[in-house]
C-alpha cells in the first residue's frame, strides 16, 4: 500500500490553476523575512510616553542589527500589558488623550502599538463598544483585542458577546470596514505573542520576533522526494533559516538587557508569499480539497518542533484577505468559514481576516466566536478571530480594498 508521502508525490498537479510553483519558488531569492520585532513594555494607568519611547529606541537598534545581517524587517511594534482592561469607564475615556499621544509617537517611528486586551473579565461592559470606535477614529497605529477564552477560566461568553458587538460597530467606523483590521477576539493567547492585533505583554521588558516563511515551506515541499518525510524535511528547512535569526536575537538581548521571548514560527503570508501555494506544493491539489487538513497538520508539526525558542501562536496562519491564493480558492468555493475552523483544530491561528457580509448580525458573530473559544479551550491552544464585515456587500460578492496589505476577495457566507 502506498505511503502518505507516495500519495502526495504521485498526485500530480491537476487542478492547480493560476500558479506555477517552479516559477514562484525560483522568484524568491531570500526565503525569509522578519515580519515583526515586537517589544513588550509594562505601563501603568498613566500610559507613560517615556516607556514607549524607550521601547522604540530599542527597536531601532534591533532592526539595524537584523538589517545589517541581511534581513528585511517589515515592521516594528510595541505591545503593553492589559492596562486599559483595568480602568473604569471614566478613566478609560480620559486615557484616550494619552493614547493619541502614544499614537503620534509610534507613527513618527514608523511603528504600531497594541494596548493588549481591553476586556479580560467575563462581564458585560457595552461602554467599550463606543470607546473602541473612538479609539480607531482618533488613532492610526493602535490595535486592541479582547479575551474570549483563557487557560484559567475557559470560555468567556459575555466577552464573546461584547466582542461581536464591537466588530459590528467597527465595521461602520472607517471606510471599507477597515477598523476591524485593528481588532481581534483572542482565545488562550499567551503574553509575548508578537503578532497583532492580539499581542500583549507581561513581566520584564522583552521582545519577540515574528517571521514570514511561506517561501521556505514552499521550497521544502517543492523539492520533496518520495522517500522524504515531509515533516522532517520542513523542520530542517525551518531550522536552517530560523537558527541564525535566533543567534542574532540572543545577542541583541544580551546587549540591551531585554528578555528574548522567542520566535513565533508561524509562516505569516503576504501578498507575494502565499501559504496556500506552499500547501498546494505538498498536496498537488487546490487548497480546500482533500488532503488540505492533513497538510495543515504536517506543517504545524514541523512548526511546533523547531530547534528555536518559540512563542505566540507558532502555528499555521490562513489569513484570507492577506493571501491572494487563499482568496482565490474561497472564490472558487473550495472551502468555507467552517472549514477554516476545522483546519484550526490541527494548525494555527483561528479565523484571520475573514470577509463577511456587512449586515452580519452580532448574534451570528457571537456564535462563531464562542465556537473559536470552545475549540481553543478544548484543545488548549491559542486561537483568535479577526473578522471583516464588509459594508454593503453580501455573500458571494467581490469585496475590493484600497489597502496595500489586503487582497480583493469574494465575501464568505457565515451561516
Over which residues does each language-model region extend?
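C-terminal segment of N-terminal export signals and the immediately downstream linker at the start
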Residues: 1-2, 19-30
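Anaerobic metallocofactor- and corrinoid-dependent redox/one-carbon enzyme cores
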Residues: 25-415
Amino acid at each position: 500500500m502506498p505511503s502518505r508521502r507516495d500519495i502526495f508525490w504521485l498526485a500530480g498537479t491537476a487542478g492547480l490553476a493560476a500558479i506555477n510553483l517552479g516559477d514562484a519558488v525560483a522568484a524568491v531569492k531570500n526565503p525569509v523575512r522578519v515580519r515583526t520585532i515586537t517589544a513588550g513594555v509594562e505601563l501603568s494607568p498613566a500610559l507613560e510616553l517615556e516607556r514607549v519611547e524607550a521601547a522604540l529606541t530599542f527597536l531601532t537598534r534591533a532592526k539595524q542589527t537584523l538589517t545589517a545581517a541581511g534581513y528585511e524587517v517589515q515592521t516594528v511594534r510595541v505591545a503593553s500589558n492589559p492596562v486599559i482592561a483595568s480602568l473604569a469607564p471614566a478613566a478609560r475615556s480620559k486615557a484616550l488623550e494619552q493614547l493619541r499621544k502614544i499614537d503620534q509617537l509610534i507613527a513618527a517611528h514608523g511603528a504600531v502599538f497594541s494596548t493588549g486586551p481591553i476586556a479580560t473579565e467575563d462581564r458585560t461592559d457595552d461602554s467599550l463598544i463606543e470607546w473602541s470606535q473612538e479609539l480607531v477614529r482618533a488613532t492610526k497605529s493602535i490595535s486592541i483585542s479582547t479575551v474570549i477564552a483563557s487557560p484559567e477560566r475557559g470560555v468567556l461568553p459575555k466577552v464573546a458577546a461584547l466582542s461581536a458587538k464591537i466588530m459590528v460597530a467597527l465595521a461602520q467606523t472607517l471606510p471599507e470596514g477597515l477598523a476591524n483590521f485593528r481588532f481581534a477576539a483572542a482565545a488562550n493567547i499567551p503574553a509575548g505573542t508578537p503578532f497583532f492585533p492580539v499581542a500583549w505583554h507581561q513581566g520584564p521588558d522583552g521582545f519577540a520576533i515574528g517571521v514570514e516563511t511561506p517561501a521556505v515551506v514552499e521550497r521544502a515541499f517543492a523539492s520533496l522526494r518520495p522517500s522524504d518525510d515531509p515533516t522532517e524535511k520542513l523542520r530542517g528547512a525551518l531550522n536552517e533559516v530560523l537558527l541564525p535569526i535566533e543567534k542574532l536575537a540572543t545577542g541583541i538581548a544580551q546587549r540591551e538587557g531585554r528578555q528574548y521571548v522567542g520566535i513565533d514560527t508561524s509562516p505569516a503570508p503576504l501578498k507575494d508569499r502565499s501559504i496556500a501555494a506552499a500547501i498546494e506544493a505538498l498536496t498537488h491539489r487546490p487548497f480546500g480539497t482533500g488532503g488540505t487538513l492533513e497538510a495543515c497538520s504536517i506543517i504545524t508539526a514541523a512548526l511546533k518542533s523547531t530547534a528555536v525558542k518559540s512563542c505566540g501562536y507558532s502555528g499555521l496562519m490562513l489569513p484570507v484577505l492577506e493571501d491572494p491564493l487563499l482568496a482565490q480558492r474561497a472564490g472558487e468555493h473550495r472551502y468555507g468559514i467552517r472549514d477554516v475552523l476545522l483546519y484550526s483544530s490541527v494548525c494555527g491561528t483561528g479565523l484571520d481576516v475573514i470577509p463577511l457580509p456587512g449586515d452580519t448580525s452580532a448574534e451570528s458573530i457571537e456564535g462563531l466566536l464562542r465556537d473559536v473559544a470552545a475549540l481553543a479551550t478544548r484543545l488548549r491552544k491559542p486561537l483568535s478571530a479577526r473578522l471583516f464585515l464588509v459594508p454593503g456587500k453580501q455573500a458571494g460578492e467581490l469585496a475590493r480594498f484600497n489597502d496595500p496589505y489586503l487582497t480583493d476577495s469574494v465575501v464568505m457566507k457565515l451561516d
